[in-house]
């Protein structure tokens, strides 16, 4: 499989609304960008030229939306071939996907949780290995937010994630906000959850905001500022596992670049504090 240079430390989701501001000058704190390949693969014209302008100058990560790695439908190998060509064309450093599914006989337009079972571990792992073979690179799976536990689950979310990583021999894209969301919705300690994850598999992290629907129900929206408990959880995550490349994810209610940069700088500040304290895991 292809080997790629390590990502730098702090990234921002690349959104079309931000392109004019970014063309005027990318702030020095932004080390890399992230896109969903499905949103760009078949585009031509000005959009394609804009993307190439930035991928020629900055490192990029691709975070997939529609592979449906845990879904019952056959793996979309035509899509995977397109993704591989796209990753090669734009020299993308890392490809990640959601540890969930989004299609059955048709696209479901949402990311749904996989039942936490031994059978599902083997099924997902087989599909991940096939994905890695086609893409010719190692991938990372992102822990997903979910709101209703499957009645057929026979293992915990944590045990399921660890088992899939081991069986598939892939890496972990740790979404810190998703852990917080699930900890509120399913009543567990997010620090204990993150502590039990394998440090050597964590290659990438996300930070994002959410919507508080009720006292014991929050929705992962990527449409609001990161709240203090999630910032604290990121700080503790770095303390437990070391600093990994971390991206600010904002998909809705996108504010001006200047406002997003406050949160990007907050990530950089927390990382710097861990570097100053002698954290040996700097990338």
Swiss-Prot record:
Belongs to the UPF0276 family. SUPFAM superfamilies: Xylose isomerase-like (SSF51658). InterPro entries: MbnB/TglH/ChrH, Xyl_isomerase-like_sf. It holds the Pfam family MbnB_TglH_ChrH. Gene3D superfamilies: Divalent-metal-dependent TIM barrel enzymes (3.20.20.150). This is UPF0276 protein Nmul_A2550. It comes from Nitrosospira multiformis (strain ATCC 25196 / NCIMB 11849 / C 71). It comes from the Bacteria.
């Amino acid at each position: 499989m292809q080997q790629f240079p390590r990502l730098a430390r702090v990234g921002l989701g690349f959104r079309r609304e931000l392109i004019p501001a970014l063309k005027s000058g990318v702030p020095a704190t932004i080390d890399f960008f992230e896109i969903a390949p499905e949103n760009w693969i078949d585009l031509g014209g000005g959009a394609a030229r804009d993307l190439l302008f930035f991928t020629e100058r900055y490192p990029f990560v691709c975070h997939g939306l529609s592979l449906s790695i845990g879904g019952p439908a056959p793996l979309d190998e035509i899509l995977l071939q397109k993704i591989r060509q796209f990753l090669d064309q734009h020299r993308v450093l890392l490809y990640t996907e959601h540890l969930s599914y989004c299609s059955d006989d048709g696209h479901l337009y949402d990311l749904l949780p996989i039942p936490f079972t031994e059978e599902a571990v083997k099924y997902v792992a087989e599909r991940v290995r096939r994905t890695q073979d086609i893409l010719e690179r190692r991938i990372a799976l992102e822990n997903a937010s979910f709101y209703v536990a499957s009645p057929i689950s026979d293992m915990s979310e944590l045990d399921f994630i660890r088992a899939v990583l081991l069986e598939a021999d892939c890496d972990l894209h740790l979404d810190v906000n998703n852990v917080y969301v699930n900890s509120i919705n399913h009543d567990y300690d997010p620090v204990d959850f993150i502590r039990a994850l394998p440090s050597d598999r964590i290659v990438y992290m996300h930070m994002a905001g959410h919507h508080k629907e009720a006292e014991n129900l929050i929705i992962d929206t990527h449409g609001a500022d990161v709240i203090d408990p999630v910032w604290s959880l990121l700080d503790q995550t770095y303390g437990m596992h070391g600093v990994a490349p971390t991206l600010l994810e904002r998909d809705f209610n996108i504010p001006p670049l200047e406002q997003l940069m406050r949160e990007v700088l907050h990530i950089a500040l927390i990382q710097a504090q861990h570097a100053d304290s002698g954290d040996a895991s700097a990338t």
